[in-house]
Each structure stands twice: as structure tokens, then as C-alpha cells.
Regions:
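Walker A (P-loop) phosphate-binding motif
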Residues: 95-108
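N-terminal leader/targeting and accessory segments in enzymes
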Residues: 1-98
Length: 108
């Protein structure tokens, strides 16, 4: 994975994804519509830029800063990120896609 990865949704899964990406030396942009204290502390600990509550019109610019996007569970299908990612041709993954990518076990 190269470039910057935008992680949307910084609950338990999103924070774990950010941590895993940072451990693999991937640049991360964390985004949450309503980040809590724990999400802010995690972003600070990982030295990840955190964007809080972006307006709907901000998504094309945010997605344009990323080479890929990882969405946490619970992000609704109608979230403006999806339209922005499609328009920009940016791949959207979830945590299981990311895990499969990193799984180096032999395949049958």
C-alpha cells in the first residue's frame, strides 16, 4: 500500500485500521463526522491528521488527497464519501478487504 489512505469512521474498528496502517508506514488521514475523545487521542498518539465533521462539499477534496479509502462498519451507503470516491476513481475498502490484502497465507 502506498500513498495516503483516508480512514472514515474512528470507532473501535477505524482506530484499529489506523493503527495497523501506521505500523506499516502508511500515511493516514482520519475522518469522522462526530469524533469522540478516544478518537482524537488515538489520532494524536499515531500522529495522524484528523478531519472532524467535514461538510458534504468537502468530500471531493478530502478523497482527492487519498489513494485509497477504508470505511469503518456503520458508515451508511448514502454517505457523501462514496459518491466522491466514485467520481475520483478512488478505491473504497473495508477492514476485511484490508485484512485479505495483508494475508500472506498460501491459497488453494
Amino acid at each position: 500500500m502506498s500513498g495516503r489512505v483516508l480512514v472514515l469512521g474512528l470507532g473501535v474498528t477505524g482506530r484499529a485500521v489506523m493503527d495497523a496502517l501506521v505500523r506499516r508506514d502508511v500515511e493516514v488521514l482520519g475522518v469522522d463526522d462526530r469524533p469522540g475523545v478516544v478518537a482524537r487521542a488515538c489520532a494524536e498518539r499515531l500522529a495522524v491528521e484528523l478531519v472532524e465533521a467535514p461538510a458534504p462539499g468537502d468530500w471531493p477534496r478530502l478523497v482527492g488527497r487519498a489513494t485509497e479509502v477504508v470505511v469503518a462498519p456503520g458508515i451508511p451507503d448514502g454517505h457523501p464519501l462514496f459518491a466522491a470516491a466514485e467520481a475520483a476513481g478512488v478505491l473504497v475498502l473495508d477492514e476485511s478487504d484490508l485484512a485479505a490484502r495483508w494475508d500472506d497465507r498460501p491459497r488453494c
